[in-house]
Regions:
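Conserved C-terminal structural/oligomerization subdomain of aldehyde/semialdehyde dehydrogenase
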Residues: 31-37, 222, 357-358, 365-422
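Residue-level signal for inorganic ion chemistry
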Residues: 13, 32, 68, 90, ...
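ALDH superfamily catalytic-core signature
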Residues: 224, 232-375, 398-399
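Glycine-rich loop-to-alpha-helix module at the N-terminal edge of alpha/beta enzyme cores
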Residues: 33-122, 133
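Short, well-ordered beta-strand elements within core beta-sheets of diverse protein domains
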Residues: 35-41, 56-62, 147-148, 258-261, ...
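Structural signal for hydrophobic packing residues in well-ordered secondary-structure cores
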Residues: 57, 61, 76-83, 87, ...
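Rossmann-like NAD(P) dinucleotide-binding subdomain of oxidoreductase/dehydrogenase enzymes
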Residues: 125-268, 322, 395
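Terminal low-complexity tails and localization/encapsulation signals of metabolic enzymes
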Residues: 1-37, 70, 74, 124-147, ...
């Protein structure tokens, strides 16, 4: 077990070890080894983080927006200087291939710079009143204290996605990283310290959703909750937030459909759909989760897609670069993928390639999978898979395809492949 990470809370500009005795193990999904363990933030420490964020917010909101933005640029500069280290950490604890992790780190720095520019665009309004000798002034003011609750699939970028808009608009924030990917968040908190961000403006706590996340969702002192993750967790957060009528901003799961019409460039569709399914081992909420194919081209498309998935390489991203994807995040994720694939098979679907976990390595890997003869009411079509699995459904015409695509409890994205947008 590595001692490289000694995760500590970052509260009021200081690092401190939690008094909690509950420890969480951080597992490398590529080989199932223990990277490190850390103490879950105690109830008292979470409450302290919220309190200092509350106390710091008034002064921070009065700081000129352009000055607030300058801290975002300093953080972005720090990210770029430490890019290689952040990439290494993300690959190690989350299982991304190196190129994807590098893109995430670079995207985070770019997003900070982009958000900093909004300091010049925080504007109010003067509205002419219906009453004489009166004008209406509209001011944009900060929400107050934001809690940012992060997912594990893009753990680094989502830090800045929560932090940057909050800070530039005069809010303070308490961030909880996923317990699966806390090391990159801890290293990020060190950047904040080096950038000189005022004490109490940004605070980091660590732990499970059922404990630390619940506190950040139920506190009366939190003015807004920003969460990215599963529908189930989002629903639980809404339940807690409703008790105080706290504003929530939720980005939840997805079941993105891809429609392949008869006039589509089949090779292009195969390439894009394959890439969109295996990116981050299929653990991306807005990438293809189900494919609808016109019956007239179904045989050709299915054959080419199956070959493309058979040629897809996976492996340990810590040691290999010639791979398309790495491991699933944990055993629970692997079990969910297996359960949905097995359910489809038992309901009459046909596994054309893959359909099982790779047992030849110690990591958590799942073979690239294509499943034909799926029906619209199957669980694998209706539920989020979050793995390198492509279920296929054939359709008669565009109206039926659109009906199928819209028959979902999820939102987010969709795609269509055609050479005739009319």
């Amino acid at each position: 077990m590595s001692d490289n990470y000694n995760i500590q809370n970052y509260i009021n500009g200081s690092f401190s070890v939690s008094a909690n005795t509950e420890e969480i193990k951080n597992i490398n999904p590529s080989d199932s080894s223990i990277i490190n363990s850390f103490k879950e933030t105690s109830i008292e420490d979470v409450e302290s983080a919220i309190d200092v964020a509350k106390k710091s917010q008034s002064k921070w909101s009065k700081t000129p927006a352009i000055e607030r933005a300058s801290y975002l640029k300093k953080i972005a500069e720090g990210i770029r200087k430490n890019e290689d280290e952040f990439v290494r950490i993300i690959v190690e604890e989350q299982g991304k291939i190196k190129d994807l992790a590098k893109g995430e780190v670079q995207g985070a720095a770019n997003y900070l710079d982009y958000t900093a520019e909004w300091a010049r665009r925080i504007e109010g309004e003067i509205v002419t009143s219906d009453s004489p000798d009166e004008n209406i002034f509209i001011f944009k003011i900060p929400m107050g204290v934001v809690s940012g609750i992060l997912p594990w699939n893009f753990p680094f970028f989502l830090i800045v996605r929560k932090l940057a808009p909050a800070l530039v608009t005069g809010n303070t924030i308490v961030i909880k990283a996923s317990e699966e990917t806390s090391n990159n968040a801890y290293m990020f908190s060190k950047l904040l310290d080096e950038a000189g961000v005022p004490k109490g403006v940004v605070n980091f706590v660590y732990g499970r959703g059922q404990t630390v996340g619940k506190l950040l969702s139920s506190s009366k002192k939190i003015d807004m909750i920003s969460f990215t993750g599963s529908v189930e967790t989002g629903s639980a957060i809404m339940t807690e937030a409703a008790k105080n009528i706290t504003k929530v901003n939720l980005e939840l799961g997805g079941k993105a459909p891809a429609l392949v019409l008869a006039d589509a460039d089949i090779d292009l569709a195969v390439s894009k759909i394959r890439d969109a399914r295996v990116i981050n081992s299929g653990q991306v909420c807005n990438c293809v989760e189900r494919v609808y194919i016109d019956k007239k081209i179904a045989d050709e498309f299915t054959e080419k897609l199956t070959k493309a998935m058979q040629n897809t390489k996976f492996g340990n991203p810590n040691t290999k670069t010639d791979i398309d994807y790495g491991p699933l995040i944990n055993e629970d994720g692997s079990k969910k993928v297996s359960e949905l694939v097995n359910s489809a098979k038992s309901s009459g679907a046909e596994i054309l390639t893959g359909g099982n976990r790779d047992d030849s390595s110690e990591g958590i890997y799942y073979h690239p999978t294509v499943i034909a003869n799926c029906k619209q009411d199957m669980r694998i079509i209706q539920e989020e898979i979050f793995g390198p699995v492509l279920p296929l459904v054939e359709f008669e015409d565009l109206d039926q395809a659109i009906e199928y695509a819209n028959d979902s409890d999820y939102g987010l994205t969709s795609s269509i492949f055609t050479n005739n947008l009319k």
